[in-house]
């Protein structure tokens, strides 16, 4: 029986290799590649990434990695320690589902973190009450001051897009924008 972390790392490796194939085959394509926090602690991961970046630097110039919050047991494994050996590769690392779970504001200060993907649940909550407490504006302003990309997920209408942009999102993602 394979350990859950090993199975996730195997899936992440397969998705990474498939993503690189697509990036090489389609020179104008830009991709976000999800990776589990536990995979980042796999000792083989930095070696694989280094090899792929060395062989396909232009492909990685058009890719970013979205660090997922799952699995929950990854909470005790510091993200900063996992990203440290990867810092020299010049890759973009975004915190996925920001505002929904275990990602903390402290992780936004990690030098390798270049973007936040604000979870759709925060958009829904703030849109429902017109962001009366300023939570969404706080997150987008915080990201902007740090020079980070801020994508708001779950945008499903023109009104939600306008709201997300008014709150300071640098990008939106969702069924409305055609990006899922």
Residue ranges and their predicted role:
Residues 6-79, 154:
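Catalytic core of bacterial c-di-GMP phosphodiesterases, primarily the EAL and HD-GYP domains
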Residues 1-2:
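A short, polar/charged loop-to-alpha-helix boundary motif
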Residues 15, 19-22, 45-52, 78-86, ...:
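A general structural detector for well-ordered alpha-helical segments in enzyme core domains, enriched
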Residues 36-41, 66-75, 91-180:
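EAL-family c-di-GMP phosphodiesterase catalytic domain
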Residues 28-30, 58-62, 88-90, 113, ...:
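A general structural motif
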């Amino acid at each position: 029986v394979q350990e859950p972390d090993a199975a996730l790392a195997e899936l992440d490796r397969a998705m990474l290799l498939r993503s690189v194939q697509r990036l090489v085959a389609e020179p104008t394509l830009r991709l976000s590649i999800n990776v589990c926090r536990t995979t980042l602690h796999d000792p083989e991961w930095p070696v694989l990434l280094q090899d792929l970046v060395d062989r396909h630097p232009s492909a990685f110039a058009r890719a970013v990695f979205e660090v997922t919050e799952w699995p929950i047991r990854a909470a005790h494994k510091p993200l900063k320690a996992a990203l440290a050996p990867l810092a020299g590769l010049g890759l973009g690392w975004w915190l996925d589902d920001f505002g929904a779970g275990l990602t903390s504001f402290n992780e936004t200060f990690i030098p390798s973190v270049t973007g936040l993907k604000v979870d759709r649940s925060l958009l829904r909550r703030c849109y429902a009450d017109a962001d009366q407490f300023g939570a969404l504006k706080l997150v987008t302003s915080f990201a902007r001051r740090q020079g980070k990309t801020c994508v708001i997920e779950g945008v499903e209408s023109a009104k939600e897009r306008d709201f997300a942009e008014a709150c300071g999102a640098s990008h939106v993602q969702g069924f409305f924008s055609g990006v899922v």
